[in-house]
Amino acid sequence: MSGPYDEASEEITDSFWEVGNYKRTVKRIDDGHRLCNDLMSCVQERAKIEKAYAQQLTDWAKRWRQLIEKGPQYGSLERAWGAMMTEADKVSELHQEVKNSLLNEDLEKVKNWQKDAYHKQIMGGFKETKEAEDGFRKAQKPWAKKMKELEAAKKAYHLACKEEKLAMTREMNSKTEQSVTPEQQKKLVDKVDKCRQDVQKTQEKYEKVLEDVGKTTPQYMEGMEQVFEQCQQFEEKRLVFLKEVLLDIKRHLNLAENSSYIHVYRELEQAIRGADAQEDLRWFRSTSGPGMPMNWPQFEEWNPDLPHTAAKKEKQPKKAEGAALSNATGAVESTSQAGDRGSVSSYDRGQAYATEWSDDESGNPFGGNEANGGANPFEDDAKGVRVRALYDYDGQEQDELSFKAGDELTKLGEEDEQGWCRGRLDSGQLGLYPANYVEAI
């Protein structure tokens, strides 16, 4: 008698050689196309990040360059600080180049390769996927047919074994039962014999089909291997290509290996190391400290042709280039190293006027003693000029006027070298305002 039939013995494996399990290899072709799309999306997102970072650097550099130029920092340290803004602009350009390389080179390279490697069909899907599917199906078809016969033969054999075991159990139990007649006993014995014959027949058929499957297996394996290797070659091209693309992306992203990037920071370091504290201190001493020239008081003859000899001359701007001060015995020229700021902050302008308007009535333009060279111009409307505001202006300091576009006020003096004028609002408030914010009426 054969061994007992056990349905659990029918194990389903996940092997490539099982019928239909080649579909994972076929699916890999479709996955390859999708992965190309994923890589392009990945590159696009990184390019957006590079673009945004480059713009942020540019905006940061512009804002802080203006703040530094208008601020109180001076000399070589100012130039060193400003070099950071130059670094930001140059690095911004490099990140723009990274963005352009990612989009114009790397992404386009993947897109073109994908287009050449995968060919869409009118009915959907890719030509390469269909060729692989057809190749595997053709190689597996004869073997799959044999496997179907084998499964049927095995099932018949196992069923016959099950019937044989059941018949033998009944026949053995009947021997102990008094109610079973000899005729019934004989039928049970015949049933056992018949089941044994069925087991033998199904076993022979099962073994024969199994032998046939064994004979076709080598040919089946050869055909499947051939199609699989074709898929492997296609996948190898994709893997090698994407590796090359990733290396290109790395090369574009790695600014540390970019000679221009290295040069930017070499220049920045040189600019910072060029800052000289002693030089800056000497400059400040000569332009804003004890080293400045001075018109020391001395006896002056009265000259009827010069009615305002007692009035002090206006000081030059703090950082104006080529500022010259002269005295009675000679002229001494002091040149600023900071350069023309273009737009002077209220800090600088306030410093200049704080020294101009002293409490000495002989030099105070607000003084009321006419013997000192003239009357206070703020007290005489006839000496003022009516002007109209072109733009809104909000005073940033206590000595500045505030007005709206269209407001009228009185101009009480000429524009100074820093672009400010003295004026009076109709409310009587006196102060300073930007000269180019108004027009004569």
UniProtKB/Swiss-Prot annotation:
Known outcome of mutating residue 276 to A: Reduces membrane tubulation
Record PTM: Phosphorylated by casein kinase 2 (CK2) and protein kinase C (PKC).
GO molecular function: cytoskeletal protein binding; identical protein binding; phospholipid binding
Keyword Phosphoprotein carried by entry: yes
Keyword annotations: Cell membrane, Cell projection, Coiled coil, Cytoplasm, Cytoplasmic vesicle, Endocytosis, Lipid-binding, Membrane, Phosphoprotein, SH3 domain, Synapse, Synaptosome
Topological relation to the membrane, as annotated: Peripheral membrane protein
SMART domains listed in its UniProt record: FCH, SH3
Domain F-BAR stretches: 10-280
Keyword DNA damage appears in the UniProt entry: no
Polar residues: compositionally biased ranges: 326-348
Coiled coil: 23-272
Positions where Phosphoserine occurs in the chain: 2, 76, 343, 345-346, 358, 362, 402, 427
Record remark: domains: The F-BAR domain forms a coiled coil and mediates membrane-binding and membrane tubulation. In the autoinhibited conformation, interaction with the SH3 domain inhibits membrane tubulation mediated by the F-BAR domain. DNM1 binding abolishes autoinhibition.
PANTHER family attached to this UniProt entry: PROLINE-SERINE-THREONINE PHOSPHATASE INTERACTING PROTEIN 1, PROTEIN KINASE C AND CASEIN KINASE SUBSTRATE IN NEURONS PROTEIN 1
Protein name (database record): Protein kinase C and casein kinase substrate in neurons protein 1
Source organism (scientific name): Rattus norvegicus (Rat)
GN (gene name): Pacsin1
